[in-house]
Regions:
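Feature activates predominantly on carbohydrate-active enzymes
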Residues: 92-310, 351
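Active-site neighborhood of glycoside hydrolase catalytic domains
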Residues: 260, 272-379, 385-387, 392-399
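Active-site-proximal beta-strand/loop segments in catalytic clefts of secreted hydrolases
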Residues: 53, 110, 185, 240-242, ...
């Protein structure tokens, strides 16, 4: 009997000693901060159930769909201990996670929904590249190297449907991006529906020569649905309304906010440049108090939909020639003691910054809003031009976030 027991023990020891690492390295995008690969493997056939805190069940549902779509694996949620266990650990820093793959169980620990998404994204990437339908036994400890990891979508020049936006959010989560910047308005279209101004999306998305492209915009319900879905993916959406320039589509609906009045037409990107009308008059009248009342209505509409602490208010590429010929703008210029026409935009920038801050939000603007140092320490700049490095340095020296 003793001999048999010794033989069994020796055989078990032999099996253990022969066990090797399934792989020597794993490929993740982005690279994880720390990866330790151990001997042994977890068979994917054992991944059958997920135990997750109630607050993260929608995120786990997303992962279940991702598994079915990318790896043809069918997994369900369970209230008992699953083969994948997701645990909340508030000691972990923002967006950090730990992923432990053992021979008989997988465990993800995170302190917030972003960390959960990142842990699941790493697991999904490992599953998609699995060797012989097995995952290596390993430990990953990871957190982002950069706080802002974003993607901008120009929804004004090219309309993205709700389903297309959700698919984009899926891809963003896969690569652990955390911010979607939605450019909602421009000369080409005004995509933001506002109850107080029903003609905005009617006239601001109408193209006489491209009827098939007309009438595409986002209702409040559409945007709230996108925001909610983004939240389950751990992604923040920052809305942008581009003012005081880039406003042809706005002026098509509200020409009274222009300096000269008259008829304006939204200009689809597909329209030939030679057929675009009044393109040089794409700014609102800063000397008209109605422009500021409208801007506040826009801010209120964005706050109702988007929980982000940020509102991007544009501010790029604003010529001053029309303002210089506008009696209302020049009256403002003289009344405020301005010394250059560019200060007309600076006046608008400061007013918007104060207004947005008074509503508990932070204004973001394109780099041009700080050409004459109009941005304040509470504002954030988005640098986009080729000379942005120098502008960035100057802004940072003045205590402005970039």
């Amino acid at each position: 009997m003793k001999k048999n027991l010794l033989a069994i023990a020796a055989f078990a020891l032999l099996l253990t000693s022969c066990e090797t690492k399934l792989v020597e390295k794993v490929d993740l995008i982005p690279l994880a901060e720390n990866v330790e690969i151990h001997k042994g493997a977890f068979p994917l056939s054992n991944l059958q159930s997920i135990q997750v805190p109630d607050e993260w069940k929608l995120t786990a549902d997303n992962f279940v769909k991702d598994l079915q779509k990318t790896a043809s694996l069918t997994v369900s949620l369970t209230d008992s201990e699953g083969s994948l266990v997701i645990v909340k650990d508030e000691s972990l820093s923002a967006e950090a996670y730990r992923l432990n793959i053992e021979k008989n169980r997988i465990k993800i620990e995170a302190g917030d929904i972003q960390g959960v998404n990142h842990g699941l994204a790493s697991l999904l990437q490992l599953i998609m590249t699995a060797k012989d339908a097995q995952l290596p036994v390993l430990t990953i400890q990871d957190k982002p190297a950069f706080g802002y990891r974003g993607l901008m979508l120009d929804c004004a020049r090219h309309f993205w449907t709700v389903d297309e936006l959700k698919e984009t959010l899926d891809h963003m989560a896969f690569f652990k991006l955390n911010t979607l910047h939605m450019h909602l308005t421009d000369n080409q279209a005004w995509r933001l529906s506002m109850d107080k101004y029903p003609d905005l999306v009617k006239e601001g998305t109408y193209y006489y020569d491209f009827p098939e492209l007309s009438g595409k915009y986002y209702s409040k319900e559409d945007l709230k649905e996108i925001v909610t879905y983004a939240g389950t993916r751990g992604i923040e959406i920052i809305p942008e309304v581009d003012l005081p320039g880039h406003s042809i589509a706005l002026l098509a609906a509200l020409p009274e906010l222009s300096c000269r009045g008259g008829k304006f037409e939204a200009t689809p990107e597909e329209r030939d440049w030679n057929k675009r009308k009044r393109g040089n008059e794409n700014m609102i009248c800063i000397g008209n108090p109605q422009s500021f009342a409208f801007a506040e209505d826009v801010i209120d509409a964005l706050i109702e939909i988007f929980p982000s602490q940020y509102i991007h208010f544009g501010g790029d590429e604003v010529p001053t020639d029309i303002w210089e010929e506008c009696p209302k703008c020049m009256a403002l210029y003289k009344r405020e003691g301005m010394k250059s026409p560019g200060e007309i935009q600076d006046y608008f920038t400061r007013k918007m910054s104060d207004l947005i801050r008074s509503k508990g939000k932070i204004m973001i603007g394109w780099g041009e809003i700080n050409d004459r140092h109009a941005a304040g320490p509470n504002d954030v700049l988005t640098i986009w031009r080729d000379n942005g490095v120098e502008k960035q340095k100057i802004a940072l020296e003045h205590g402005i976030s970039v």
